Amino acid sequence: MNALSRLLFLLPAFLTASPYVIDTISFPEDVPVEVGALDFAENGDLYVALRRGDIFVATPQEAPDQFAWRHFASGFHNACGIHIVAPGHLIIGQMAELTEVKDTDKDGIADSYQALSTEFGLSGNYHETMDICSDGNGGLYLAPGTASHNGPTFTTPRGNFADAGRFGRNYASVTWRGWVLHWHPETGITPFSSGYRMHNGIERDPQTGHVWCGDNQGDWRSSSPVYHVREDSFSGHPSSLVWDPRFAGIENPLLLPRRLLDDLWNKPAFRLPRSMMNSCAEPAFLPESFGPFAGQMLIPDQSGDRIVRLMPEMVDGAYQGAATMLIEGEPLHRGNNRLAFDHHGTLYVGQTGRGWGKLSEGLQRVRPTGDFGFEVITCQLSSSGFQLTFTEPLVKATNLRLTRYRYNYGYSYGGDELETKVVTPESVEIDSDQPTILHLTLPEGDLLSDHIYRFDLSGVSSDSKSYRGKLTYTLNRLLRPKAEHQITLTASGDDRYRVEINGDLFTEVRTKGFSNPILYPIHGPSGLAMTRDWPVREDGRPNEQQDHPHHKSLFLGHQGINGTNFWHENREESGIIEHARTIETRSGEDRALLRTFNLWKDSEGTVICTDTRELTFGLTDQGARYIDLELNLHASHGPVTLEEWKDGFLAIRTHPHLRLKPAKGKGV
């Protein structure tokens, strides 16, 4: 090859700067580098926990082959989580326990191992990993994974064993598997969120304090989801519900009514297709060193050679958003399992094989060069389509197409893209004032909730580059229309929700203190009360008849379900309807919404059935206030018989001035 041809061969690489420099960090030759966890101490030292049981520490060096690794601790059972309290003081999440590890004599080797918690079960199944992350307040969040049908459980598990938890491909036969737990040194373990299959990675956003975890495609997972972990939420995999006391006594969680699971399901903020993700691992949040992407989320692929960049945005009270690639392909290895940033903003990637697919293990370092290429910075939902912001001004945007599809939610392992439709934008406009911004308007009716949009942006280019990246948007909710009136719903203590219209009280949903949840008071547009005060207020109001004590403003009930009376109170056969969970609230603009889960219990406290209900509060165009109720009654705990009685379901006891009095012999 002559000098000219060599120059021409090198020219494209010279002109196109790489956004990242990737190094492979050397380890001692006799150490299998299967990284379960890694993090940096405040002094800059890097601690790496290996799944084979050892922890190593080194001070990072400029040259990747000059890290002087020191053996710090050993004897761990598949250590997959690490929290560094201080140099030489760690908390490790291993399969069997949460363990505090200290170097008390300051010789560089751990000499104190203390079990902080063994409150979660251990079945002996190989699949039960556990990552951890800080809660920012002295505690930790734990992510104990479920077991796999590909491996057995031992005959002597630790903790309680539930036969009902042994069903399905991935199962939760021992305590708290498939949950996110909260641990604090003063309170121990508290269940936080259920419904996870294999949440191999959990992290807290340092800006918002919100907790995130990914999960893996599999049973009850059509694709690889990423969840915003909300307290007392259910993320869709039912096996873990056997450890929820509200479902005590169920024989098989997989046979719970599908409508109940649908109603409880906290939908993932991101649903990543197989073309982008095979197995979600530990999330991380980008520091300032990553320029325009700072604050966004990364999630690595434990079964692929890629790291995905996520762009969360809050829409109508819940997260959703776009996903694209940060890095894909060589020199990045496969098996990307754990992420950590040093104090300079350099990304370290810990890799491990899991026993299937092409194995890869090791430790790599990713350093941004400052030239981030031609990429999408953000992709945000608009009222008529999407708004994209790029790293460089645009000169062309033609032939754009989107592919819309959805996934099923159900027992099947994985799932296909369903109801696929190519959507051609009605208009594509480069912003005249800010040419890095691209506005896409879709035809009316083509912007749908509960769908995923895949973008073909090959017709978009800057002055010197064409866009070649992958981009999808998980659209769970549409933007609410702007409204003249603000309708808000806020918690008031732990026993009620207050609904206001432009700051004036509409009603309160009272979830405790009575034999069933009620709405009281209910005010009309002029502020007048629409329902009776007694017996909610013991003194009632003047001239109010104090009869039918079960008539509490607006309530739900039924006189006979499986022999239990959920209408009248203080009778031998009377039961109660107990508010068990707030599924979600939405507030602002043109309506407020409350979704709850409730237990119908007999006189001995046994759950007969359950309900999910959705209350929507709003204003008509004419200014009238309305309450919309959707009630789903579920045979979740066994067969349900609705007996034939005159009293059942919705009832309202109005203000005395609104009452119609019957004429003798004629009725009302």
What are these regions (language model features)?
Residues V509-F514, I518-G524, T620-K666:
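Acidic (Asp/Glu-rich), glycine- and aromatic
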Residues F9-P19:
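Bacterial Sec-dependent signal peptides at the C-terminal "C-region" and cleavage site
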Residues A17-G373, I377-T389, K396, V428-S432, ...:
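Beta-propeller domains with acidic blade repeats across secreted/periplasmic ectodomains
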Residues D371-P481:
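Acidic, low-complexity Ser/Thr/Gly/Pro-rich repeat segments typical of extracellular/periplasmic
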Residues M1-L10:
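Sec-dependent signal peptide recognition
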